């Protein structure tokens, strides 16, 4: 799969020459996970695996299987490229192999949106065996909420190859659309409807379904509201969203998230004899939640829900779903991660993952797994990029759009000192990857050039109002706490002698605090700022993403 931001970045690298006045060179970026639990509980028995199977922000997972290949996608909100594509052969060892929305033409609406509240929500990945085509359908939520959202889909015959241009679906309102391909060849889209009329009661929500013609690529007829929930006169329920439909043994099963996105989050299931319903709610719902457990328990996984289920070639069922790993004080920088658990079946024929006080544990065993989990997405691992390739790795993202006008790669990463800051709503000269551990060490080495006033270094992002920037800037090493608009604060600053050569920059996360260090050419690491509170970029400061970290250069005033 070709990544546009990366491919064009390299093309520019072949036609531009390095200008030390206007570019910063990054020699490498490394990331090392250091979570205590993984160190103290190694995988030793065949079948062992860690949850989350994709650590760090990997929310709203959707999965499908074709043959013995499993494919999974997650949300990206205001980041580009959109919709990471993961591949696995065993359900627990996942590799980030590409990005579905990798060209600017596939996702032209991100500029100016909130990084963690706007953009791409809840992509759903499906395979239609009747035309041997993969479909990814999603919503781009515009500023102002669901009423301004754009629902669209893209297709591909090969998920590792190119995906089509987006096809807009103006007839599909609301958010969280998902395809269902019935065994008779018919296709449908199920989605959460907007809350406009008729609103029947407080907090009214509805799920709708509409037929889809795979020949024309368009919807057929009008949407049918087939499941209504909310705070009504008979039951106190919160919004249903993220719906998926499955046909199992001749019955239609509807799964939907319920309860919002915080600790009361859950997944519920329904069953019907017809795809249009009526759907009967399972009497023992929720089929998945952790809201009944004590919040101060050891190593809690909270907010479990937004599930998708898949059947193995051997006939077993598994669920992927989102969850959170907060510290006991309820905060973290990881966001909502992707977990895997087996699906069980009740005596009355409904699927479920947990009941009552069942826990989502961090270490589990998958009997069919030969050996133990092998993954660069779970447990402690080291990730390093020397930027030696003319294409960047698929883990890298930018803010609000394509970063290629500002970067080139090959013998290091060169970022132009663009006069765009990382909070502006326009794409700055930065690339970022997800934080995947409470405790980690990330470092880079930068040759800043000689541009007066330019700043280059390590950037940590929660959203456009909450960031931290460890920068080399005009004879100083500076740690900024970046806030709303120009509300920026210098946390620490040290003057450095004029040096020739690369300067090392490092952040060590200790979970609730960060240590920031720098290293002059040929020297040792020096502490710049110790025990800096991490709450400035905590997940709980709002929005739906976790935090990211990477490298950044700017000539904008800080």
Question: Model-found features: residue ranges?
Answer:
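Carbohydrate-active catalytic/glycan-binding domains of CAZyme proteins
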Residues: 21-558
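Bacterial Sec-dependent N-terminal signal peptides
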Residues: 1-22
């Amino acid at each position: 799969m070709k990544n546009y931001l990366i491919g064009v970045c390299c093309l520019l690298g072949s036609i531009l020459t390095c200008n030390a006045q206007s570019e910063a060179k990054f020699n490498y970026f490394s990331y090392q996970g250091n979570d205590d639990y993984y160190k103290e509980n190694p995988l030793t028995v065949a079948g062992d695996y860690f949850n989350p199977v994709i650590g760090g922000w990997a929310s709203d997972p959707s999965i499908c299987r074709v043959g013995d290949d499993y494919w999974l996608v997650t949300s990206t909100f205001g980041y580009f490229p959109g919709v990471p594509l993961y591949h696995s052969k065993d359900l627990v060892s996942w590799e980030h192999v590409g990005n579905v929305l990798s060209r600017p033409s596939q996702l032209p609406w991100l500029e100016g949106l909130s990084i963690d509240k706007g953009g791409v929500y809840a992509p759903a990945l499906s395979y239609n065996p009747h035309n041997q085509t993969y479909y990814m359908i999603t919503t781009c939520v515009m500023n102002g909420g669901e009423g301004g959202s754009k629902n669209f889909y893209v297709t591909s015959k090969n998920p590792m190859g190119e995906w089509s241009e987006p096809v807009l679906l103006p007839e599909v309102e609301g958010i969280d659309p998902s395809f269902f391909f019935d065994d008779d060849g018919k296709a449908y889209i199920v989605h959460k409807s907007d809350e406009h009329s008729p609103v029947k009661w407080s907090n009214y929500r509805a799920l709708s379904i509409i037929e889809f013609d795979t020949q024309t690529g368009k919807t057929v007829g009008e949407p049918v509201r087939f499941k209504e929930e909310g705070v009504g006169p008979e039951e106190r329920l919160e919004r249903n969203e993220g719906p998926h439909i499955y046909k199992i043994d001749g019955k239609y099963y509807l799964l939907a998230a319920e309860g919002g996105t915080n600790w009361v989050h859950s997944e519920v299931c329904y069953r019907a004899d017809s795809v249009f319903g009526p759907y009967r709610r399972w009497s023992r719902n929720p089929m998945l939640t952790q809201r009944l457990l004590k919040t101060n328990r050891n190593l809690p996984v909270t907010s479990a829900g937004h599930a998708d289920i898949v059947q193995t070639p051997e006939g077993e069922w598994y669920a992927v779903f989102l969850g959170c790993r907060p510290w006991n004080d309820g905060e973290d920088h990881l966001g909502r991660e992707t977990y895997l658990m087996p699906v069980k079946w009740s005596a009355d024929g409904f699927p479920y993952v947990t009941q009552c006080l069942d826990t989502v544990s961090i270490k589990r065993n998958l009997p069919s797994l030969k050996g133990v989990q092998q993954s660069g997405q779970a447990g402690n691992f080291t990730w390093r990029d020397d930027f030696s390739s003319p294409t960047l790795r698929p883990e890298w993202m930018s803010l609000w759009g394509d970063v290629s006008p500002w970067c080139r790669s090959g013998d290091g990463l060169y970022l132009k000192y663009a006069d765009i800051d990382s909070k502006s709503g326009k794409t700055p000269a930065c690339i970022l990857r997800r934080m995947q551990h409470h405790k980690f060490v990330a470092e880079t080495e930068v040759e800043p050039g000689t541009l007066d006033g330019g700043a280059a270094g390590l950037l940590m992002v929660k959203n456009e109002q909450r960031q931290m920037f460890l920068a080399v800037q005009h004879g100083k090493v500076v740690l900024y706490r970046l806030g709303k608009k120009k509300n920026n604060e210098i946390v620490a600053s040290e003057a450095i002698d004029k040096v020739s050569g690369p300067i090392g920059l490092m952040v060590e996360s200790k979970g609730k605090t960060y240590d920031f260090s720098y290293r002059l050419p040929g020297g040792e690491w020096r502490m710049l700022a110790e025990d800096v509170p991490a709450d400035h970029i905590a997940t709980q400061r709002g929005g739906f993403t976790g935090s990211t970290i990477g490298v950044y250069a700017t000539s904008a005033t800080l």
